Structures are given as structure tokens and as C-alpha cells.
Amino acid sequence: MNLYPWLQHSYKQIIYPHYINKGHHSIILESHKNIGITCLAKHISLWLLCQKKNKSIYHCKTCHSCQLMNSKNHPDWHYFGSNTCLSKNSSKTIGVNEVRNFTNTIFNSAQQGQNKIVYIPNIKKLTEFAINSLLKIIEEPPQNTYFLLINYLPHKIITTLRSRCIIHNLYGPTKENRIEWLKEQNINTNQKIHMSMLYSNEISFISKCKHSLFFLYQERLNFFETLLTSFQEKNFLKMLNVLNNKKCLDQIFIWICGIILDSIKWKHDINTIIINTDQTKIIQILASNFSILSLDNSYKSWIYCYNNIKNIPGINIELLFVKQLLYWEEILNIFN
């Protein structure tokens, strides 16, 4: 997979110190999800393991090491958790025993005679004891061993780990990046509705492109039509069916929070930066009928609802949505 253009600058910033032999052995990549951070981690790994890396800041693609990486069989690239049946999407934590098990492996010499990489795709899965055990290794690492860790915001890294690593904060693509990349993928960006979808949240850009744009287009239209009807009939519970759509749950929160933010912009007469340009009717209803305070509290309540869904295992999502819709109606009535 090619490196995404909006991550090229970050890639060069990370690789160049290593190219001149002044790089740090422990790197943390920190960002929100779905901007291509795992792709960046792979390209960093490819270069660190490349047998011809002294010739360029990019891996050569042809040496034996590069071929092993592309076939996912490199013996010196250690995916943290692969030996414990943990996948990247697993909800299980990684404990101190797993750290001790892989420690024995990395203290051996590199099988390809180059570097070794320990790749941890999500710091959040490490228990406190696992982190403490990992810290001991990072403080005195084996020769030619690099640690590449990913931290997804808003999760906060403990101070002791932060102080022992170089942290690179990564950001999503700009509008220009997105349009250019979509053109390269032969995706039509002329339709205003698609542009609204793509601009609504930069951190989920790649995630949206992985889905069918047509599917999201239909779901988004259905969502806003139901939202408009709910306001017109003054019955928020009508939204329950569209909210309870697990196929695009994250997008639903993006849409509803986005429309609330647009209505706040409208009240402040800054209409030029509105995202949902095709939904001005709903924006005007919110802006003309509700106060800034009620809209602000509405936005916060939906963020709180989203965090509960993401962070409370086994929560009854439908019941939570019923509670949230009734609470939202109460907010709009009380603070208006």
C-alpha cells in the first residue's frame, strides 16, 4: 500500500533522523483513528528493515528484507500480540506475561542481520503491569531494536512511557489532500452531497472511502429526512430506528454533531464554513428556534452518549438512544 500523501511530511520527519544515524529507538505515533496511521507504521518498518536503506529515505522494495515484509513473513518484525491470538481489533488486553514471552525473542540476534522491530498497534490494550515491564526493556533495549507504538486519541499515555519515547502527533488530510487523493482513486467528487460527507469529519476520511459512498449517501439522506420530520412533528423518538443502525453508527454521531455545530455557526453568521451545505433547512430550524446554550448542551450530550457506547462493554444501545433522545428534547426545552 502506498503512503497517503498527507502523511508524507510526517514520514520524512520520522525517518530522516534515523537516516543520519541520530534516530530514537522508541517511537510513538499518536493520532485519531482512520487517517492511515497503520500504513505509516508499515512504511517506517519497511525502511528500518530494508537492506539498502543507506541509499534513500524510502525502502528499496526489491531486497530480500522488503520482500519478506510484503509477504508478512519477516522474522525480525514482531507484531505484539500475534503469539497470543490477539488481533488488532481484539478487545482483549495484553498482560505482563505476554511482554515477558516476547522479551526472550527480541534479545536474540536479528535473523536477517539488520534491525529488529517491536510493533504495538494499540497502546491502550497494554495493562499497567505490561507497560511497566515494557519500560524496563525500552530503558535498556537490545542492540539494533526499535519499538514502534501507536496511541489512538483520546487515550492518554502514562508519563513514564511518554518520557522514554519520541512522540509524533499526526493529523488528518486537508480538504485539498482529500480532493486530490479521491481524484487519484477515480472517485467522483463533483456532487455536493458527497463533498459534505467527506468534509464532515477529517479523522474518519479513509474509513468513509472504504465503505460504499453510495451506501453512505442513502443512509445520510435517510437520517436527515428523519431528523427533519422529528422536529416538524416534535417527536424525537421517531429517530430511534435510524439511530439504531449498526452499519454506520460512528457516522450517525458525526452527522448529528455536525448539524448542531453548523447551526451554531449559522447563529454567529459564519455560514461560509458550514459543512452540511445541503441541509440548510434543518440548520435554520435549529438556529432560529434554539439558543446557543441549548445547542452547546445538545452537542455535549451526544458526545457523552457516543463515549458511553464506545467505552461501556455490553451496554444496551437502543435503550441508551431512547434515554438520549428524551434528554435531548429536555435540553432544548429547558435551555431555550
From Swiss-Prot:
GO terms for cellular component: DNA polymerase III complex. It catalyses: DNA(n) + a 2'-deoxyribonucleoside 5'-triphosphate = DNA(n+1) + diphosphate. It comes from the Bacteria. GO terms for biological process: DNA-templated DNA replication. Keywords: DNA replication, DNA-directed DNA polymerase, Nucleotidyltransferase, Transferase. One of its GO terms (molecular function) is DNA-directed DNA polymerase activity. It is an enzyme of class 2 (transferase). Pfam families: DNA_pol3_delta2, DNApol3-delta_C. Its EC number is 2.7.7.7. PANTHER family: DNA POLYMERASE III SUBUNIT DELTA, REPLICATION FACTOR C / DNA POLYMERASE III GAMMA-TAU SUBUNIT. DNA polymerase III contains a core (composed of alpha, epsilon and theta chains) that associates with a tau subunit. This core dimerizes to form the POLIII' complex. PolIII' associates with the gamma complex (composed of gamma, delta, delta', psi and chi chains) and with the beta chain to form the complete DNA polymerase III complex. DNA polymerase III is a complex, multichain enzyme responsible for most of the replicative synthesis in bacteria. This DNA polymerase also exhibits 3' to 5' exonuclease activity. This is DNA polymerase III subunit delta'. It comes from Buchnera aphidicola subsp. Baizongia pistaciae (strain Bp). The lineage of its organism: Bacteria, Pseudomonadati, Pseudomonadota, Gammaproteobacteria, Enterobacterales.
